[in-house]
């Protein structure tokens, strides 16, 4: 079941929380709405579900406008962060509930309901807990029950509002893998809200990064990491070094160091430089690619690579986080050399293109 979000705006009083949002979600895709608090991601999810109504715009499921349909008529499954299980019902009865309250013409008979719930319990790996009550379950088990209950009525679309937010880190990781496997098996269309970058990129087919009621980028997880569309996406995804410098003529100056950009940008003046740890050139010997001396402050082996915190020597004040590959991990206090050639430069929110990027843009024009 595909979802079309067309020009959705939403305001609460004088506060605009969604600004002309448009997004197409193909059938069978799992999409993460990722952003900080106040970005509008949960409001958008609730509008898709019919739990909130947009100020303007349309929601279409497989081409049919459902904008005015009540939530119960949209055939959407919704999983909340805090489970919302019935405390006085067993696991089996919690999952059964949605089926028993269907209109008579849609309601399966008792035998069919029992068979379906039994199958769902096996699918969510809780068949041995069918007779227990919510108070007797762990957080991860409760969330599996909530998901099985949502799937019992065979929703056209599954929506999840920070489904793992109340769980500890290890349980979250296990449930993320399990949800992804379940999605691969059932191929349902799903949209989930999260503020966790790792969760979004690990589980989703596509990540929609939101900020202040706008979509900053909607792309495959790897693309969001490697080719952030805006400065906000670059910074929000985390693991990024930021240095302050200046463009003068055709050169970029940072501290006592400078290097040629290969052309003279129209903009001249202060800029911010961004580099993810694995984008920093690093070597034990000075070279054209790695001319800047640094000293190792911390070294954290991660298996096939080592994550380092290094202090620039004489050319910048703040430490950098870098990644060095290989088994021969540097020691605390060791001198290394880094290069910043792969940096992204920004004047405020405006990207300053490098020479290679300028050529690529010219060739594609």
UniProtKB/Swiss-Prot annotation:
Nucleotide-binding recorded as keyword: yes
InterPro entries attached to this UniProt entry: AAA+_ATPase, ABC_SmlMolc_Importer, ABC_transporter-like_ATP-bd, ABC_transporter-like_CS, Mo/tungstate-bd_C_term_dom, P-loop_NTPase, Sulph_transpt1
Pfam families assigned to the protein according to its UniProt record, in alphabetical order: ABC_tran
Cellular localization per UniProt: Cell inner membrane
Molecular function in Gene Ontology: ABC-type sulfate transporter activity; ABC-type thiosulfate transporter activity; ATP binding; ATP hydrolysis activity
The organism's place on the tree of life at top rank: Bacteria
Residue positions binding ATP: 35-42
Any one GO cellular component localisation term in the record: ATP-binding cassette (ABC) transporter complex
UniProt enzyme class: translocase
Record field: catalytic activity: sulfate(out) + ATP + H2O = sulfate(in) + ADP + phosphate + H(+); thiosulfate(out) + ATP + H2O = thiosulfate(in) + ADP + phosphate + H(+)
Its EC number(s): 7.3.2.3
Ranges of residues in domain ABC transporter: 3-237
Function: Part of the ABC transporter complex CysAWTP involved in sulfate/thiosulfate import. Responsible for energy coupling to the transport system.
Family the entry assigns: Belongs to the ABC transporter superfamily. Sulfate/tungstate importer (TC 3.A.1.6) family.
Oligomeric and partner information: The complex is composed of two ATP-binding proteins (CysA), two transmembrane proteins (CysT and CysW) and a solute-binding protein (CysP).
PANTHER family for the chain: SPERMIDINE/PUTRESCINE IMPORT ATP-BINDING PROTEIN POTA, SPERMIDINE_PUTRESCINE IMPORT ATP-BINDING PROTEIN POTA
Protein name as catalogued: Sulfate/thiosulfate import ATP-binding protein CysA
Origin species: Shigella flexneri
Protein's gene: cysA
């Amino acid at each position: 079941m595909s979802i079309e979000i067309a020009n959705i705006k939403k305001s609460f009083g004088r506060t605009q929380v969604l600004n002309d949002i448009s997004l197409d979600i193909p059938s069978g895709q799992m999409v993460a709405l990722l952003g900080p608090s106040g970005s509008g991601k949960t409001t958008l999810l609730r509008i898709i579900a019919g739990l909130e109504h947009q100020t303007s715009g349309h929601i279409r499921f497989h081409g049919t406008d459902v904008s005015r349909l009540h939530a119960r008529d949209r055939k959407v499954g919704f999983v909340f962060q805090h489970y919302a299980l019935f405390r006085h019902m067993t696991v089996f009865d919690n999952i059964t509930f949605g089926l028993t309250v269907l209109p008579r013409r849609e309601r399966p008979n008792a035998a069919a309901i029992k068979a379906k719930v039994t199958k769902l319990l096996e699918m969510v790996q809780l068949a041995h807990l069918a007779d227990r009550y919510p108070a007797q379950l762990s957080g991860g088990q409760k969330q599996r029950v909530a998901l099985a209950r949502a799937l019992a009525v065979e929703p056209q679309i599954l929506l999840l509002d920070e489904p793992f937010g109340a769980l500890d880190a290890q349980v979250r990781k296990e449930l993320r893998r399990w949800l992804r496997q379940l999605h691969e098996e059932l191929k349902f269309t799903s949209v989930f809200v999260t503020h966790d970058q790792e969760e979004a990129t690990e589980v989703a087919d596509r990540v929609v990064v939101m900020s202040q009621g706008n979509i900053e980028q909607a792309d495959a997880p790897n693309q969001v990491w490697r080719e952030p569309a805006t400065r906000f996406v670059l910074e929000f995804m985390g693991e990024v070094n930021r240095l302050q410098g200046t463009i003068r003529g055709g050169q970029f100056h940072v501290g006592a160091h400078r290097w040629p950009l290969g052309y003279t940008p129209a903009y001249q003046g202060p800029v911010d430089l961004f580099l993810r740890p694995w984008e920093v050139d690093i070597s034990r010997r000075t070279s054209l690619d790695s001319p800047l001396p640094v000293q190792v402050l911390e070294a954290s082996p991660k298996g096939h690579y080592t994550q380092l915190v290094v202090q620039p020597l004489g050319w910048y004040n703040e430490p950098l986080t870098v990644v060095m590959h290989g088994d021969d991990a540097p020691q605390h206090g060791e001198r290394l050399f880094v290069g910043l050639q792969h940096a992204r430069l920004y004047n405020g929110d405006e990207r300053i293109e490098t020479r290679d990027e300028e050529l690529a843009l010219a060739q594609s024009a």
